């Protein structure tokens, strides 16, 4: 026996139906009357559709809904050909469009963008054209720099630069050798120093041709590159200097006993014609020779050897002033050279050479404590 019917089996609990019937003995007296059964006329007026027709109508409605759903979805677009390489490996750019009226496409083959209804853009991915523009722009200044350096090396100013800045032609701004500036545009001007040849001329060793080229109308024709080192190396070149004004010996010096050859008057013109050789200092050194009288000149004995040589060396105070013996005067001065060397080793004053004192020692003549016979003395300079 089931547990739900224990009370009913014992008779303790009445069934629910009996309890309800006992509470309401008139079943029709309740306010909630059941609805009347449908009449036959109503059933005749309302036809009942067959179940097969209803199933067909439901299937048609579901098919119409699916068709509208398919039409709403965009059809898969056909791949467009690239206008550059005519490749079909293209794609539509969803997130990189400029406007919806002109959709943007990208070609994976040539890596170019183009817009529908617009022009093809020659801009590759990664900015390659920008790099090309930078390289092309950097080529222009490099070409200009190379042109300027070549113009500077050749030593000529470009026409455009000369027209913009005419000072370049006059001041020689392109010249890198500042020690010897070029004299551009000074051919018509009178030379400032007529006796000094141009240091830039290639004919420095030819004084006559050099002066003619420097002072003539075509002075720039012989101008060449001549550096300071070449000037120092050319010891054999003959560079004349302007004539120095003759200085007479003051009377007070002669009265005091100073026999300075430098203050004596120059020799007469007849003697100058015989002594045509000119030293590197520009004035004749033969004025202090043996025929000039007493006293010793520093460059007196040097003139005998220098008048025979066509090209002498620049004489400075620190050089050895030993006279150069020529072939003609070798016999006359052979004894003097020996005395000169002996006096130089002894450290005394000048020795007597052919009637006059040997050069190279100024201490006896300048100080006055020496004699013409070579007595007394100090260290030679």
Curated annotation (Swiss-Prot):
Compartments where found: Nucleus
InterPro entries: Dof, Znf_Dof
Annotated keywords: DNA-binding, Metal-binding, Nucleus, Transcription, Transcription regulation, Zinc, Zinc-finger
Chain spans, region Disordered: 19-81, 329-349
Zinc finger (Dof-type): 80-134
Cited Pfam families: Zn_ribbon_Dof
PROSITE patterns recorded: ZF_DOF_1 (PS01361), ZF_DOF_2 (PS50884)
UniProt biased composition (Basic and acidic residues): 68-79
Low complexity: bias regions: 23-32, 40-59
Location (main, coarse): nucleus
Molecular function GO labels: DNA binding; DNA-binding transcription factor activity; zinc ion binding
GO CC annotation: nucleus
UniProt superkingdom: Eukaryota
Binding, Zn(2+): 82, 85, 107, 110
Role description: Transcription factor that may transactivate seed storage protein genes in developing seeds.
The protein's name: Dof zinc finger protein 2
Organism of provenance: Oryza sativa subsp. japonica
């Amino acid at each position: 026996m089931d547990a739900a019917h224990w009370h009913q089996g014992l008779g303790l609990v009445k069934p629910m139906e009996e309890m309800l019937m006992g509470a309401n003995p008139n079943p029709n007296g309740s306010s909630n009357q059941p609805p009347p059964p449908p009449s036959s006329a109503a059933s005749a007026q309302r036809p009942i559709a067959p179940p097969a027709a209803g199933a067909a109508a439901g299937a048609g409605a579901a098919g119409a809904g699916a068709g509208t759903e398919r039409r709403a979805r965009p059809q898969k677009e056909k791949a467009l050909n690239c206008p550059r390489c005519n490749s079909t490996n293209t794609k539509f750019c969803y997130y990189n469009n400029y406007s919806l009226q002109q959709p943007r496409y990208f070609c994976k083959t040539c890596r170019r963008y183009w817009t529908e209804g617009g022009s093809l853009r020659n801009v590759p991915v990664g900015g390659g054209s920008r790099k090309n523009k930078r390289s092309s722009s950097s080529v222009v200044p490099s070409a200009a720099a190379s042109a300027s350096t070549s113009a500077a090396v050749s030593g000529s100013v470009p026409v455009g630069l000369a027209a913009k800045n005419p000072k370049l032609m006059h001041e020689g701004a392109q010249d890198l050798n500042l020690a010897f500036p070029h004299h551009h545009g000074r051919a018509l001007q009178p030379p400032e120093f007529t006796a000094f040849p141009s240091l830039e001329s290639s004919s420095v060793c030819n004084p006559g041709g050099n002066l003619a080229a420097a002072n003539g109308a075509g002075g720039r024709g012989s101008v060449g590159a001549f550096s300071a080192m070449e000037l120092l190396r050319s010891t054999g070149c003959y560079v004349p200097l302007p004539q120095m004004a003759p200085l007479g010996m003051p009377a007070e010096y002669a009265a005091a006993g100073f026999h300075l050859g430098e203050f004596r008057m120059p020799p007469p013109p007849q003697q100058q014609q015989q002594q045509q050789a000119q030293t590197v200092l520009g004035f004749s050194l033969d004025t202090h020779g043996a025929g000039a009288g007493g006293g010793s000149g520093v460059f007196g004995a040097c003139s005998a050897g220098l008048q025979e040589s066509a090209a002498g060396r620049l004489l400075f105070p620190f050089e050895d002033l030993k006279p150069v013996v020529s072939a003609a005067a070798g016999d006359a001065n052979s004894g003097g050279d020996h005395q000169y060397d002996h006096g130089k080793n002894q450290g005394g004053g000048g020795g007597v050479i052919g009637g006059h004192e040997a050069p190279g020692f100024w201490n006896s003549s300048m100080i006055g404590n020496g004699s013409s016979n070579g007595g007394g003395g100090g260290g030679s300079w």
